A protein has these predicted regions:
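Proteins with a high burden of low-complexity, intrinsically disordered sequence enriched in S/T/G/P/A and R
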Residues: 44, 126-128
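Winged-helix/helix-turn-helix nucleic-acid-interaction surface
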Residues: 64-126
């Protein structure tokens, strides 16, 4: 029996990309975990996914309220967008569905982060 240290895996199916720049944005561990899970779930062609707060919470070990807090934070930092969806029941009633998350290009988030850093620097210089 031949020993193989690492089993062969399909790079596209078994792995997901996480940009290196994500660690330069000053994100908390919860934000990084949530962002990584959304990257894991996303469709690689549309950059969209639609897990529920409960599904995300179970995957990363957070409560639904904590997931909502971090989703709002990632939206504010322009890393993701979230759009409400709706579903129809068998009886024809319209209900709220899961949010549709779109993972935005990391360059936009970096640009906003650097702009905020410059604004803070200018404010600190004015105070001195």
């Amino acid at each position: 029996m031949k020993f193989t240290r690492y089993p062969k895996r399909d790079a596209i199916r078994d792995y997901f990309p996480l940009p290196n720049e994500i660690f330069s944005l000053g994100l908390s561990t919860g934000e990084i975990a949530l962002y990584a899970y959304l990257m894991y779930c996303e469709d690689r062609k549309t950059f969209q996914c639609h897990p529920s707060y409960k599904t995300i919470g179970n995957a990363v070990g957070m409560s639904k309220n904590t997931v909502k807090k971090y989703v709002d934070s990632l939206i504010e930092k322009q890393l993701i967008t979230a759009e409400p969806t709706s579903v129809y029941t068998q009886k024809g009633k319209k209900r709220n569905g899961n949010l549709l998350y779109t993972v935005r290009p990391i360059a936009e988030a970096l640009e906003q982060y650097y702009e905020q850093q410059l604004i803070r620097l200018h404010e600190e210089n004015r105070r001195q």
